[in-house]
From Swiss-Prot:
Species for this entry: Roseobacter denitrificans (strain ATCC 33942 / OCh 114)
Lineage start: Bacteria, Pseudomonadati, Pseudomonadota, Alphaproteobacteria, Rhodobacterales
Name of the protein described by the UniProt record: Uroporphyrinogen decarboxylase
EC numbers on record: 4.1.1.37
UniProt record similarity statement: Belongs to the uroporphyrinogen decarboxylase family.
Pfam families: URO-D
Length: 344
């Protein structure tokens, strides 16, 4: 039964003797089987839009490690592509998009009710996964948070300081907020379709939340997360939402109450002890082992994993990394982490 799934129990506020575990980017280039399937697909976007192959790479880490959750294999930039932005990937450099910096650029975007024409293969991937995943494994869908997605749409690429997005916000706030509103509404529909296809949990990734300060954090990180969560809860009241305002620092405090999310995912810039005292008091937390341990391994990996489990043992906790696993990670270190979490 779904109610017995450990991830869902933690998200409902239950403190378990052993925390459930999954890993951001658990389907990825550190796994040889992923690289083989990626080669079969031809390129990254072709893999995302091929339901059978996307389901296969989602299932690979479940078969290998027995994680408590599978996260849909996709990308946060599929939504901007569905809204009409050009999207391509440059080998060794990452994503590129056509930029949205003028009203004319914005006017070329598609309305939200047209996104399914592009995103239907993603929903089919979800349906395949619900059929093929082990009964005890929770299926997580996801999307990027509006601020983070906007930073890519404005700059046309990832940037170290999100300066182009901050510049548009300051110079043409009306256009900036119109773009954020379009992304917010698109995110609500995109996540709702994932849920209708079978996702049991959804996660909102705000990878660049840490670059928002003060009133901007409230307005462009908290408020969109609250709006999306409220809309999801109105349509799907039983579906938990995880929020990840990466590098929010003190902004993690009160995030769950301000947004309505069921769980706050933590990066590893905050200590587990601090987060237990300041964030876990409001409910479930997820995290927050440094992904570098998946590369270096050794006793430090075991010790830090056990320390995080201990720090969060007084409340609901889902074990995860503080950032996505990197391509240079050792697959054996992932198993060592899992064994340490599960007390083996």
């Amino acid at each position: 039964m779904a109610a017995a799934k450990t991830i869902l129990r933690s998200l409902a506020g239950e403190t378990l003797p052993t925390p459930p575990i999954w890993m951001m980017r658990q389907a990825g280039r550190y796994l040889p089987e992923y690289k083989a399937t990626r080669a079969q697909a031809g390129d990254f976007l072709s893999l995302c839009y091929n339901p059978e192959l996307a389901a296969e790479v989602t299932l690979q880490p479940i078969r290998r490690y027995g994680f408590d959750a599978a996260i849909l294999f996709a990308d946060i930039l599929l939504l901007p592509q569905a809204l009409g932005a050009d999207l391509w990937f440059v080998t060794g450099e990452g994503p590129r998009l056509s930029t949205i910096t003028t009203q004319a650029d914005f006017d070329k975007l598609k309305p939200v009710d047209e996104i399914d024409a592009v995103l239907n293969p993603i929903y089919e991937t979800v349906r395949i996964l619900r059929r093929e995943l082990p009964q005890e494994t929770t299926l997580i869908g996801f999307a990027g948070a509006p601020w983070t997605v906007a930073t890519y749409m404005i700059a046309g690429r990832g940037t170290p300081d999100q300066a182009p997005a901050h510049a548009l916000k300051d110079e043409n706030r009306e256009l900036f907020e119109a773009l954020l509103a379009r992304i917010t509404q698109g995110t609500i529909e995109y996540l709702s379709r994932q849920i209708e296809a079978g996702a049991e949990v959804v996660k909102i990734f705000d990878s660049w939340a840490g670059s928002l300060k003060g009133a901007d954090f409230q307005r462009y990180a908290l408020e969109p997360a609250r709006e999306i969560t409220a809309a999801i809860k109105a349509r799907h009241p039983d579906i938990p939402v995880i929020g990840f305002p990466r590098e929010a620092g003190d902004g993690y405090i009160g995030f769950a109450k301000a947004t309505g999310v069921d769980c706050v995912a933590l990066d590893n810039s905050v200590s587990a002890e601090w987060a237990a005292a300041n964030v876990q008091v409001d409910g479930c937390v997820q995290g927050n082992l440094a992904s570098s341990h998946m590369v270096t391994g050794g006793q430090a990996l075991i010790d830090e994993t056990r320390a995080i489990v201990k720090a969060f043992s007084g409340g609901p906790h889902i074990f995860n990394l503080g950032h996505g696993i990197t391509p240079d990670a050792d697959p054996d270190n992932v198993q060592r982490m899992i064994d340490a979490v599960r007390g083996q």
